[in-house]
Amino acid sequence: MNKLVECVPNFSEGRDQTIIDAISKAIRDTAGCTLLDVDPGKSTNRTVYTFVGCPDSIVNGAINATKVAFKLIDMTKHHGEHPRMGALDVCPFVPVRNVTMEECVNCSKEFGKRISEEIGVPIFLYEEASTQSYRKQLKQIRQGEYEGLEEKLKEEKWKPDFGPAKFIPSYGASVTGARSFLIAYNVNILGTKEQAHRIALNVREAGRGDNEPGRLKFLKGIGWFVDEYNLAQVSMNLDNYRETGVHTVFEECSKDARELNLGVAGSEIVGLVPLEAILMAADYYIAKENLFIIDEALKVRLAIERLGLSSCSFFDPKKRIIDYMVQEDLKVTQPLASMSVRGFVELLGSRTPAPGGGSASALIAAMGAGLGAMTGWMTFGKKKFEALDSIMRELLPPLDKAMRDLIPYIDADTNAFNDYIKAMGTPKGPQRDIAIDKALKQAINIPLSTMKISNTCWGPLLKMAQYGNLASKSDLEVGCKSLETGIWGAHRNVSINLLDCKDAQFVESTTKEANEILKNAQESLQKVLEILSNRKE
């Protein structure tokens, strides 16, 4: 799946719908950005936007929105209940999927540098992007707000990270940085506000004070009573769900509730949640209850049920899980893998250089892993092979994962070839040489990745050959031969492209790695076939 970053800019306008809509349009019109939510507040005179995209697109979206704010918002006339210091007050970048915090820090720095250069405004870094302790938190930087900014900018220690140390009355200054995804999460308690707050004091990081900290890191919380639901809630913010997961919070609150002889009536997530957080919860309950669930949709369903996420209102994964709200159109991102079998085969046989052997090898390897998984499924859950269930639980996940991981390489190989041809067509010069080298190495690394992923299957396949349902013997044989053929085909692509590579060290290390994988595949195939040949009912 592609990289996904969330951006949550707060603009100092919550009353003028024309301006609010203009900023929304700037985000929507940015290629690669998906606007998920617009939340204006009249009393705060502030609007919070939530949009997502890949790292490059997300920065462009933030820049386009800020340019509109620079033109339309006049801070000399701004009044509202919320603290602020600029037309764009704060612009955090948040990792959602396949993105590191470091990449989000880079997004914030690129945004700060580019916007300060393009419209000439002061930009401060905060949270993970800041390296100075006295100006790391938003409240530290924003102290004094817009009204105190002119004098603040005169101090050397408050020199902006980007842009001029100059007060711009109509704009002010902005803060940008990177932070973890914040999850607003409430656990429902059949009790009083005071009892819910007692639980909150037990679990939140701050606890009851410095001398009595709570049990869970990166957690803020209070207790309150919700008349609409007729129950109390432990209302919390998870500042880092990777360190303290939703399931951990639910279990800890439930434990304290039991000790107080209180009932727990599920929980609710307010706003959006990353898929990863839900899958982490599912994996926890799968391990706790010794379940065997591979399918993602079933994992999501399990987490919803165990956490009671639909207890207050229906939890619709398609509308509440951020990854599903920006579901990639596979016909666009993976056109080859989305074709019919007939269509793909006919395209292979057409008068075009791509798709070719590399894409075919990825498909053949994926089918090989798939047939290995099929053998496992034809064994697992059957009364006749009940004694083998624990073994199938071990073997099925890596084969299923390899099958799914290989499918995108059908398109990736063709894309890499096309990028190389494009680089070859650029005008001669140093930039052309750099572009060709980069594209060529990508055209080598893609089939090498096909080999690496495929190579992870041999251990499970050797064991599957020993224990799998013999009624699927021929399926497993075809699968293993397909996997070996896919590896061989990818090896041929690696080898042919290495001939044009001028980086001797890269050629040597890649050749060695590819040859080792091919040798292992050929030897492993023979072992599997021998095991199957010798097995009897």
Curated annotation (Swiss-Prot):
Keywords: Cytoplasm, Cytoskeleton, Folate-binding, Golgi apparatus, Histidine metabolism, Lyase, Multifunctional enzyme, Transferase. Residues 336-537 are annotated as: Cyclodeaminase/cyclohydrolase. The active site is at 82 (for formimidoyltransferase activity), 413 (for cyclodeaminase activity). Residues 1-181 are annotated as: Formiminotransferase N-subdomain. Its EC number is 2.1.2.5, 4.3.1.4. Residues 182-326 are annotated as: Formiminotransferase C-subdomain. Pathway: Amino-acid degradation; L-histidine degradation into L-glutamate; L-glutamate from N-formimidoyl-L-glutamate (transferase route): step 1/1. GO terms for cellular component: centriole; cytosol; Golgi apparatus. Residues 327-335 are annotated as: Linker. It catalyses: 5-formimidoyltetrahydrofolate + L-glutamate = N-formimidoyl-L-glutamate + (6S)-5,6,7,8-tetrahydrofolate; 5-formimidoyltetrahydrofolate + 2 H(+) = (6R)-5,10-methenyltetrahydrofolate + NH4(+). Folate binds at residues 163-172. Signal peptide: none annotated. It is found in: Cytoplasm, Cytosol; Golgi apparatus; Cytoplasm, Cytoskeleton, Microtubule organizing center, Centrosome, Centriole. One of its GO terms (biological process) is L-histidine catabolic process to glutamate and formate. It holds the Pfam family FTCD_N. It comes from the Eukaryota. SUPFAM superfamilies: Formiminotransferase domain of formiminotransferase-cyclodeaminase, Methenyltetrahydrofolate cyclohydrolase-like. GO terms for molecular function: folic acid binding; formimidoyltetrahydrofolate cyclodeaminase activity; glutamate formimidoyltransferase activity. Folate-dependent enzyme, that displays both transferase and deaminase activity. Serves to channel one-carbon units from formiminoglutamate to the folate pool. In the C-terminal section; belongs to the cyclodeaminase/cyclohydrolase family. In the N-terminal section; belongs to the formiminotransferase family. Homooctamer, including four polyglutamate binding sites. The subunits are arranged as a tetramer of dimers, and form a planar ring-shaped structure. This is Formimidoyltransferase-cyclodeaminase. The lineage of its organism: Eukaryota, Amoebozoa, Evosea, Eumycetozoa, Dictyostelia.
